[in-house]
Amino acid sequence: ALWKDLLKNVGIAAGKAVLNKVTDMVNQ
């Protein structure tokens, strides 16, 4: 279903954002 793909994409995007934020914190 379209909404499932949308939800998955949002979840992946959120996961990447969190990962980037954690990486920035570790690098500082």
Curated annotation (Swiss-Prot):
<keyword id="KW-0027">Amidation</keyword>
<dbReference type="InterPro" id="IPR022731">
    <property type="entry name" value="Dermaseptin_dom"/>
</dbReference>
<keyword id="KW-0929">Antimicrobial</keyword>
<feature type="modified residue" description="Glutamine amide">
    <location>
        <position position="28"/>
    </location>
</feature>
<protein>
    <recommendedName>
        <fullName>Dermaseptin-1</fullName>
    </recommendedName>
</protein>
<comment type="function">
    <text>Has antimicrobial activity.</text>
</comment>
<dbReference type="GO" id="GO:0006952">
    <property type="term" value="P:defense response"/>
</dbReference>
<keyword id="KW-0964">Secreted</keyword>
<dbReference type="GO" id="GO:0005576">
    <property type="term" value="C:extracellular region"/>
</dbReference>
<comment type="similarity">
    <text>Belongs to the frog skin active peptide (FSAP) family. Dermaseptin subfamily.</text>
</comment>
<dbReference type="Pfam" id="PF12121">
    <property type="entry name" value="DD_K"/>
</dbReference>
<keyword id="KW-0878">Amphibian defense peptide</keyword>
